[in-house]
Amino acid sequence: MQVLVRDNNVDQAMKALKKKLQREGVFREMKLRNFYEKPSEKRAREKAEAIRRARKLARKRAQREAGIVTAKK
């Protein structure tokens, strides 16, 4: 991963690098790989994440539909 350093502004480059790494999920991956995760624990975690994503999607859909209904009135 590369980040351009402009005008010797290292702080800004570090900020940009951190943002890119965060978006790519590198920090999360490092945290997960820090210790061994049993396959059963991995399945449980992935299932919980899927449920969380589904709830979040349903909540967004409900808000969008409610916004459309109130906008028509």
UniProtKB/Swiss-Prot annotation:
GO cellular component, one term: ribonucleoprotein complex
Cross-referenced PANTHER family: MITOCHONDRIAL 28S RIBOSOMAL PROTEIN S21, SMALL RIBOSOMAL SUBUNIT PROTEIN BS21M
Protein's name according to its UniProt entry: Small ribosomal subunit protein bS21
One GO term of the biological process aspect: translation
Recorded superkingdom: Bacteria
Range of residues in the leader sequence: none
Molecular function GO labels: structural constituent of ribosome
Family of the protein in this entry: Belongs to the bacterial ribosomal protein bS21 family.
InterPro entries in UniProt: Ribosomal_bS21, Ribosomal_bS21_sf
Pfam family, one: Ribosomal_S21
Entry keyword set: Ribonucleoprotein, Ribosomal protein
